[in-house]
Amino acid sequence: MLEKFERYPLTFGLTPIEKLDRLGKHLGGKVEIYAKREDCNSGLAFGGNKLRKLEYVIPDAIASDADTLVTVGGVQSNHTRMVAAVAAKIGMKCLLVHESWVPHEDVVYDRVGNILLSRILGAEVRLVDDGFDIGIRRSWEKALYEVKARGGRPYAIPAGASVHPNGGLGYVGFAEEVRAQEEQLGFAFDYMVVCTVTGSTHAGMLVGFAKDGRQRNVIGIDASATPAKTKAQVLSIARHTATLVELGSELAEDDVVLLEDYAHPRYGIPSEETKEAIRLCARLEGMITDPVYEGKSMQGMIDLVQKGFFPAGSRILYAHLGGAPAINGYGYTFRNG
């Protein structure tokens, strides 16, 4: 599906699929749970899902003769960390706009984790007061203008690389990769669980799995707390991406499965249930999930298993998208483990 698109390699290649046997047994043993470890996909600044997306964005950045990658996210954005790492790798400058998406209680929140890594990577880091939104950000547009004004050649990468024209392609590739691994495993996954915020990871998976009719088996767990806007953005990105890859079938609104029950109390703030899911996964599998994204999707998957959402015998693939560095910004929350 992606043969005609230029790709700049930023990842090691195939990411491993690991059975979460102890977690599955703890939850009753009626389903099998696996994780695809996108958190282990690269040596670039701890890796993560954004690199898979950026592989299809960076060729255009290089071709445009840009000298500065400019992007936006929250203070503990995984995406901005990844863009900073990629800029260092390809020899470009980097300007990161960090908006105040999360009302945090930890005094070192803006000095540890992802933002610390971005500073170490040499990015110009800018903190602004604008609040959370998944759309095009005014602060980011201002930064692009300022780079031009000082003689630079900026390349615009939106939040999560999601509404970039090629933002959905990487996770079409994820689905293709899973299909190849399923042949090796000797079975196909019945459901795929993924965290959804800016939407292109979910959208790309939806398009990729639509090739074999499994688009509604991609279960998005909303972590944005703006589900209507997020669902609309997933559908928009998916339809655009389907056109790019010539899927050959129309995607319906109902193809976007987005569960809204796990983003509470708001973006970037973990509920008690999310914290417990993070602890449970860590203590049963040694797998670290973060309070912003993966902790919420892990909580969602655990709750769905416990409620019987997945039929007995189902094989579930949890997409671990990375993000563990953000947990450093929640030291007070997890001060006692």
Swiss-Prot record:
Cofactor: pyridoxal 5'-phosphate
Pfam families linked: PALP
Enzyme class: hydrolase
Gene Ontology biological-process annotations: 1-aminocyclopropane-1-carboxylate metabolic process; amine catabolic process
GO MF terms, alphabetically ordered: 1-aminocyclopropane-1-carboxylate deaminase activity; D-cysteine desulfhydrase activity; pyridoxal phosphate binding
Domain of life: Bacteria
Residue positions where N6-(pyridoxal phosphate)lysine is found in the record: K50
Reactions catalysed according to its record: 1-aminocyclopropane-1-carboxylate + H2O = 2-oxobutanoate + NH4(+)
Keyword tags: Hydrolase, Pyridoxal phosphate
Enzyme Commission number(s) from the entry: 3.5.99.7
Family: Belongs to the ACC deaminase/D-cysteine desulfhydrase family.
Family matches, as NCBIfam families: ACC_deam
Complex formation: Homotrimer.
Functional note: Catalyzes a cyclopropane ring-opening reaction, the irreversible conversion of 1-aminocyclopropane-1-carboxylate (ACC) to ammonia and alpha-ketobutyrate. Allows growth on ACC as a nitrogen source.
Protein name: 1-aminocyclopropane-1-carboxylate deaminase
Species the sequence originates in: Mesorhizobium japonicum (strain LMG 29417 / CECT 9101 / MAFF 303099) (Mesorhizobium loti (strain MAFF 303099))
